[in-house]
Regions:
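A short alpha-helix-loop-beta-strand transition element characteristic
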Residues: 13-15, 150-151, 200-212, 236-241
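Short loop/edge segments at beta-strand edges and connector loops
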Residues: 10, 30-32, 101-103, 109, ...
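Flexible, glycine-rich terminal cap/loop adjacent to redox cofactors
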Residues: 198, 216-227, 232-322
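Glycine/serine-rich phosphate-binding loop and adjoining beta1-alpha1 elements at the start
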Residues: 1-27, 43
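Rossmann-like dinucleotide-binding cores of NAD(P)H-dependent redox enzymes
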Residues: 41-45, 51-114, 120, 181-187, ...
């Protein structure tokens, strides 16, 4: 195949850790396989405490499975504001999900109708085990070793700021280039390549705007920018405010008082440094904050913005009244 422009967009595939018995187990599935189950597992084990694992843990718990999350990390959601992460964990536990942190899996043993996960903290028996231990760039079958296309130490296709590989005219977009693994980032990768091919190339990885993330549990948990600790570690002037959903009118209308909003700002420049929203509509409202950050809108402006009532968005008035 020959072309002036070639774009590689092969995505990512689940990472299978070298745990004895995992790859061979007929009761262990990845994030694709768990969507193809014909029967609801009575006991579901989830290996990994990242977004994929937690979203499926929440889903299957809601459907009626007894869910246990085995997480090798010592801290639950370590990249989330600690106070918000603690709330999220407590709600999921109240809903019936069991969490075990700092668990190291040693072996998977299949039985007749179930499997046993052997760990350093005991053995656990499940009907189905979801292994959600990360995803890696999907370069298998591309035969890159027969080309001049370079890959990183982590197995991603190496790209420059325009997402062009080491071979001119060949671009890599989406998960395969080692960037943030979100569908909307793959779409933004397209914008970068399109701008380079048809414009002036001014929009690239170095000029890319802020982007938010959302963990789709109940309630949803969304975040953009820096956490309080990250901002302090950078030596920035920091002011913070945390607002419980229980203090929000719409929370009472929704009859759901779970969650909290937290903002991190620079009191000297009036910039928004980051925000974490945990509550109904968080995945929607976080985009308003992201746009404000991209356009350097001071947090003092949002504190005085007129919002409709009663909405969750109107609580940005109080959140940014710092």
């Amino acid at each position: 195949m020959t072309a002036e422009t070639i774009i590689i967009n092969t995505g990512a595939v689940p990472t299978i850790l070298p745990i004895p018995g995992l790859a061979e187990s007929k009761f262990a599935v990845d994030s694709t396989g768990i969507q193809r189950l014909e029967n609801l597992p009575k006991r579901l084990g989830v290996l990994g405490g990242g977004p994929i694992g937690l979203e499926f843990a929440h889903l299957y718990n809601t459907l009626g499975s007894q869910v246990t999350v085995l997480d090798a990390a010592d801290t639950f959601l370590p990249r989330i504001e600690p106070s918000i992460a603690a709330l999220a964990k407590s709600y999921l536990e109240e809903d019936g999900i069991q969490f075990l942190q700092g668990v190291h899996t040693q072996e998977i043993k299949d039985g007749q109708n179930s499997l046993t996960v052997v760990t350093d903290k005991g053995d656990f028996e499940f009907d189905i085990l979801l292994y959600a231990t990360g995803r890696k760039p999907n370069i298998a079958g591309l035969d890159l070793e027969n080309t001049d296309i370079q890959v990183t130490d982590r197995g991603a296709i190496k790209v420059n700021r325009h997402l062009e590989t080491s071979v001119p005219g060949v671009f890599a977009v989406g998960d395969v280039n080692g960037g943030p693994q979100f569908t909307y980032m793959s779409l933004d990768d397209f914008r970068i390549v399109f701008n380079y091919l048809t414009g002036d190339g001014s929009y690239n990885l170095e000029t890319r705007n802020n982007y938010a993330t959302t963990l789709f549990i109940a309630p949803p948990l969304a975040q953009v920018g820096l956490t309080e600790q990250e901002a302090r570690d950078k030596g920035l002037p920091v002011a913070v405010k945390e607002l419980p959903v229980a203090a929000m009118p719409r929370g009472h209308v929704n009859a759901d008082l779970r969650g909290a909003f937290k903002a991190v700002v620079n009191p000297e420049t009036k910039e928004i440094l980051g925000a974490t929203l945990f509550g109904e509509a968080a995945g929607e409202i976080i985009n308003l904050i992201t746009m404000a950050m991209d356009n350097k809108i001071p947090y003092t402006y949002i504190a005085k913005q007129i919002f409709t009532h009663p909405t969750m968005a109107e609580n940005l008035n109080d959140l940014f009244a710092i």
